[in-house]
UniProtKB/Swiss-Prot annotation:
<feature type="binding site">
    <location>
        <position position="614"/>
    </location>
    <ligand>
        <name>substrate</name>
    </ligand>
</feature>
<dbReference type="InterPro" id="IPR006103">
    <property type="entry name" value="Glyco_hydro_2_cat"/>
</dbReference>
<dbReference type="InterPro" id="IPR036156">
    <property type="entry name" value="Beta-gal/glucu_dom_sf"/>
</dbReference>
<dbReference type="InterPro" id="IPR004199">
    <property type="entry name" value="B-gal_small/dom_5"/>
</dbReference>
<feature type="active site" description="Nucleophile">
    <location>
        <position position="547"/>
    </location>
</feature>
<dbReference type="GO" id="GO:0005990">
    <property type="term" value="P:lactose catabolic process"/>
</dbReference>
<dbReference type="InterPro" id="IPR006104">
    <property type="entry name" value="Glyco_hydro_2_N"/>
</dbReference>
<dbReference type="InterPro" id="IPR013783">
    <property type="entry name" value="Ig-like_fold"/>
</dbReference>
<dbReference type="InterPro" id="IPR017853">
    <property type="entry name" value="Glycoside_hydrolase_SF"/>
</dbReference>
<feature type="binding site">
    <location>
        <position position="113"/>
    </location>
    <ligand>
        <name>substrate</name>
    </ligand>
</feature>
<dbReference type="GO" id="GO:0030246">
    <property type="term" value="F:carbohydrate binding"/>
</dbReference>
<dbReference type="InterPro" id="IPR008979">
    <property type="entry name" value="Galactose-bd-like_sf"/>
</dbReference>
<dbReference type="InterPro" id="IPR006102">
    <property type="entry name" value="Glyco_hydro_2_Ig-like"/>
</dbReference>
<feature type="binding site">
    <location>
        <begin position="547"/>
        <end position="550"/>
    </location>
    <ligand>
        <name>substrate</name>
    </ligand>
</feature>
<feature type="binding site">
    <location>
        <position position="611"/>
    </location>
    <ligand>
        <name>Na(+)</name>
    </ligand>
</feature>
<feature type="binding site">
    <location>
        <position position="428"/>
    </location>
    <ligand>
        <name>Mg(2+) 1</name>
    </ligand>
</feature>
<keyword id="KW-0326">Glycosidase</keyword>
């Protein structure tokens, strides 16, 4: 709770020595969350001009204190000398505010997910408690000293802090993610004023801030002074009500003035651009509340609005409400202004609705994190994230797991994103998680974090849901705070996942990582499949996954399954992917080279290594390939092939409110990646409308021998929007079309290849090509063309992959999960096999030379029979092509294989490769709905994905032809080309440490296991994407490039 001592008591404390103030030990007392901090309220700017307030121009009443402060660092608050309050210390260094001191060279950033970064002994924290001492000299305008009141506003300080001004103690605060304001009126004077802020890294609040993130400290959000007149607006709440017809609305503004005075009145004016829609002026004083009367300092104003433009993420129409306090003569004293969005959020008949329409949440979780600035995120970074989210078909964001800066909500309201605002509460590392949530000693601390969030942020139309916090179990505190919010703000639902995602403290079933079809029977809190959950007896609430599709590294497999379910079952209303961006930190070496660091790279303990990197984008916001899968599945236009002749498709708009007034549909028919027919038309669809479009009255006339015929459609925006550039691609689809039956064109017979047999090799020659197969190994050890070797290592079976994060799960050196795929592969010996050639024979046939080799793979040190058998049939034909037919048989004792394919190292050469298959981005068998079948060309550098923690990457599936360096591969296969071999990927901890090898590694897979992604700590690859068969067969052809 907030401690507000009597004036006499506090005046006595103000002048006490620093050591006396620190001896209060407020940071280890959950009953004290602040001292002398002002009550929470919606943001104030103190405009003296209502027009400037309406336009949102900078206020003369606000003085930013961002910039350089002097900073000294100590290992403990008790080491800070008293003299610091009067003058900077000799070791003080200029440090930017806002910033985290760990990003400025002090102390160590710590990344941990669940484990607390300190020994668990609430409310106590270690005596060794890193402490930052910030100081700055300021001058305030003389007019501010003569009249009115001046307060200082800290946007965010982690974890707790004390404030002094001119040597006098002003107050104390904790809760690192909400503003803290203090009145400085009595301590400011003319000339230089010295501000001193002592920030503690750890406090009892640390036990409530156990979020999965980097643990950093300091003044990391803006700091400013605000000057208000003696009679000022203390709080301004605005909210809207819509009639069921949506044609009539009322804007309410509940205003509080401090101090109350006779004769004051308040004006509420609503503006749309330069047009005033309506206004009202009322004297101060509320209607009677109870038998004891009314609030003299409050008034509620209301404006009726007909046919308002409604706010949604699709059509973010905003108005501006300006509230002005008038003196007894009707003269303006001060104004405040807020964006207003007319919208109604409800849960009706088991559906979350906005303006009467059921929402489909295309959401993502977002931490405030910047690779160079830590948790000090500026407006440019916020806008960058919002634009990328909108461009990739997201319509919602969850503030995981704490309130963001006020500017974030304003930007979401203006660009159009639905927001879940979440209280800064997580006790994931407690055992049980509910320990503090059910302890009345902590009730006040919990309560302030929830109630202050609501009071501060409730005016933002983008916020459609409140969240009580994250992963804190379920206690009586949650029920109490749920009821408080429902009483204070009945216009929004409340969600909370803790305690099983469906407790009485949530209006929405909001599980994390629940599967589509499979139950997870976790003790006490079973996690049902999402389809089952909504059908449980008596359950009528909507289900929205607060976290799903764990996007850690090479992930997001099975994502399409979620979206098929969302579209099939109305009460499955989407979810929030975990999460937006990799939380890595940029490190700069003395030579200027830069790389991205994760947990443990700073010597931080405890740490959870690379588990901070779960993003759809890299730290610099470059997309992961998984982002394209999310964009495609979430696209607002859905397509269906109706007929091939005439060529017709059906297009359905999933927009709820906007017409397709800026969309162009382009279509093409490709034959083996070459465009044969194309066209475009303007796409005109109303909200939620469908339309059949005829692309060609006569269909497509295929020629004899045509194959791989595909119809492609894409929707682009010809005009730029506030969030997208001209020509932005918003949706796409493709279908294979029927190919005519035809016999292949006969090929003139060429010269027969010649077979030479030596004691060691079978040597085959055809023209200027030579192939050598070792009789001992049964492997192709040389392929030369014009005397130039094409392969640097033998062409060999490959059954392993460099483990991806989803393969590793929670396994670490000190904590092994035997159920993780990588541990099962290790235990089965897949990474430690011994190859033996059982037989290798060659013969000349009518069509060429045939070599048949039998291979066996034994687990080293295991006396049992072979784990895997392979049979290769290699044929060099009279065209100089090498055909490889491969049969695989595996032991029933083996776990599912990561891959069934071949690998070799090729000589270097061309810088680009082209292929006919799925692309252009990386794709895997369970993550390929966004990839399109066509002919693609990319630089080799873009054929690998530089996941910060290296692993399997860069696969392109369903390939029919691959061309590189003068040769081509044909067949039906998946491939990758990489300068890094599997072993190096396995043995290297960071991408920047990889060293290009002598050539380029080629993998050709007949089969490849999925990557999974329902979560990253259980084996989440679905059965249909596991390689569990006992036998496999595939084939491919290698030849000199044709044409």
């Amino acid at each position: 709770m907030t401690e507000n001592p009597t004036t006499t008591a506090f005046n006595e404390l103000q002048t006490r020595p620093l050591a006396t103030i620190l001896a209060r030990n407020d940071w280890q007392n959950p009953a004290i969350t602040s001292v002398n901090r002002l009550p929470s309220h919606t943001p104030l700017h103190g405009w003296r001009d209502a027009d400037r307030a309406r336009r949102g121009e900078p206020s003369d009443a606000v003085l930013s204190l961002d910039g350089e402060w002097q900073f000294s660092f100590f290992a403990s608050p008790h080491q800070v000398p008293e003299v610091w309050l009067a003058a900077d210390l000799s070791d003080a260094r200029a440090t930017p505010v806002p910033s985290n001191w760990q990003m400025e060279g002090y102390d160590t950033p710590i990344y941990t997910n669940v484990r607390y970064p300190i020994p668990v002994n609430p409310p106590f924290v270690p005596d060794d408690n890193p402490t930052g001492c910030y100081s700055r000299d300021i001058e305030v305008p003389q007019a501010w000293l003569e009249t009115g009141r001046t307060r200082i506003i800290f946007g965010g300080v982690n974890s707790a802090f004390y404030l002094w001004c001119n040597g006098q103690w002003v107050g104390y605060s904790q809760d690192s993610r909400l503003p803290a304001e203090f009145d400085l009126t009595g301590v400011l004077h003319a000339g230089r004023n010295r501000l001193c802020v002592l920030v503690l890294r750890w406090s009892d609040g640390t036990y409530l801030e156990d979020q999965d993130m980097w643990r950093m400290s300091g003044i990391f959000r803006p700091v400013s002074l605000l000057h208000l007149p003696e009679q000022a607006l203390a709080d301004v709440r605005v909210h809207t009500e819509l009639a069921p017809s949506l044609r009539h609305a009322t804007l309410f503004s509940e205003v509080e003035v401090t101090p109350a005075a006779c004769g004051l009145s308040v004006t509420l004016a609503l503006w749309h651009g330069e047009n005033e829609i309506a206004s009202q002026t009322l004297p101060l004083g509320s209607a009677p509340i109870d038998e004891r009367g009314n609030y003299a300092e409050r008034v509620t104003l209301s404006l009726d609005v007909d046919n308002p433009l409604l706010w949604s993420a699709e059509t973010p129409h905003l108005y501006r409400a300006v509230v002005t306090l008038l003196d007894a003569d009707g003269m303006p004293l001060v104004s405040e202004a807020h964006d207003v969005g007319f919208r109604r959020v409800e849960i009706n008949n088991g559906l979350l609705t906005l303006n009467g329409q059921p929402l489909l949440i295309r959401g993502v979780n977002r931490h405030e994190h910047h690779p160079e600035k830590g948790q000090a995120v500026d407006e440019a970074a916020m806008v960058q994230d919002i634009l990328l989210m909108k461009q990739n078909n997201f319509n919602a964001v969850r503030c995981s797991h704490y309130p963001n800066q006020p500017r974030w909500y304003e930007l979401c309201s203006r660009y159009g994103l639905y927001v879940v605002d979440e209280a800064n509460i997580e006790t994931h590392g407690m055992e049980p998680m509910s320990r503090l949530s059910d302890d009345p000693v902590w009730l006040g601390a919990y309560s302030e974090r929830v109630t202050r969030m609501v009071k501060c942020n409730r005016n933002h139309p983008s916020i459609i849901i409140w969240s009580l916090g994250n992963e804190s179990g379920n206690g009586a505190t949650h029920t109490a705070l749920y009821n408080w919010i429902k009483h204070q703000d009945p216009t929004r639902p409340v969600q909370y996942e803790g305690g099983g995602a469906d407790t009485r403290a949530t209006d929405i079933i909001c599980p994390m990582y629940a599967r589509v079809e499979t139950d997870q029977l976790i003790p006490a809190v079973p996690k049902w499949s999402i389809k089952k959950w909504i059908s449980m007896p008596g359950e009528t609430r909507p289900l929205i996954l607060c976290e799903y599709a764990h996007a850690m590294g090479n992930s997001l497999g099975n994502f399409a399954d979620y979206w098929a379910a969302f579209r099939q079952y109305p009460r499955l209303q989407g979810g929030f992917i975990w999460d937006w961006a990799d939380q890595a930190i940029t490190r700069v070496e003395p030579d200027g080279s830069r790389w991205w660091a994760y947990g443990g790279d700073f010597g931080d303990t405890p740490n959870d290594r690379q588990f901070c990197m779960n993003g759809l984008v890299f730290p610099d916001r470059t997309p992961h390939p998984a982002l394209f899968e999310a964009k495609h599945q979430q696209q607002f236009f859905q397509f269906r092939l109706v007929s091939e002749n005439p060529l017709q498709i059906e297009v359905t708009s999933e927009y709820l409110f906007r017409e397709s007034d800026n969309e162009r549909l382009l279509w093409s028919i490709e034959v083996r990646g070459e465009t044969r027919l194309s066209g475009e038309l303007t796409l005109e669809l109303g909200p939620q409308a469908s339309r059949v479009l005829t692309l060609s009255d006569t269909g497509f006339s295929a020629r004899a021998g045509d194959e791989e015929i595909w119809l492609h459609v894409r929707v682009e925006q010809p005009q730029a929007t506030p969030w997208s550039p001209e020509g932005h691609l918003s949706a796409w689809a493709q279908w294979p079309l029927a190919a005519p039956l035809a016999l292949p064109e006969p090929v003139a017979a060429g010269d027969a290849p010649q077979l030479e047999i030596t004691d060691a090799e079978f040597v085959i020659r055809h023209g200027c090509q030579t192939w050598r197969v070792s009789r001992a190994s049964g492997q192709l050890i040389q392929w030369s063309d014009d005397g130039v070797d094409q392969i640097l290592t033998p062409l060999a079976d490959q059954f392993i992959r460099a483990p991806i994060d989803n393969d590793i799960g929670v396994s670490e050196v000190e904590r092994i999960d035997p159920n993780a795929w990588v541990e099962r592969w290790k235990a089965a010996g897949l990474y430690n096999t011994e190859h033996r050639c059982l037989a290798c024979d060659a013969q000349t046939t009518r069509d060429g030379v045939e070599i048949v080799a039998q291979h066996a793979y034994f687990v080293k040190g295991v006396a049992d029979g072979p784990a895997i058998l392979s049979r290769w049939r290699m044929v060099v034909d009279n065209q100089g092509a090498l055909h490889c037919d491969i049969d695989i048989a595996r032991s029933a004792a083996l776990p599912p294989l990561p891959r069934v394919g071949v690998v070799c190292q090729l000589r270097g050469g061309e810088e680009t490769a082209s292929w006919l298959g799925l692309g252009p981005h990386e794709n895997y068998p369970d993550r390929l709905s966004s990839a399109c079948f066509s002919r693609w060309t990319l630089p080799l550098s873009e054929l690998t994905t530089p996941y910060i923690f290296p692993g399997e990457n860069g696969l392109r599936c369903n390939t029919r032809e691959l061309n590189w360096n003068g040769w081509q591969a044909e067949g039906e296969f998946h491939f990758s080309l990489s300068p890094y071999g599997t072993r190096q990927l396995m043995e290297t901890s960071h991408w920047h440490k990889l060293q290009p090898e002598a050539g380029i590694w080629l993998t050709i897979d007949g089969f490849h296991m999925g990557v999974g992604g329902d979560d990253s700590w259980t084996p989440s690859v679905h059965p249909e994407y596991l390689l569990t068969a006992r036998e496999y067969r595939y084939r491919f052809t290698l030849r000199r490039r044709q044409g």
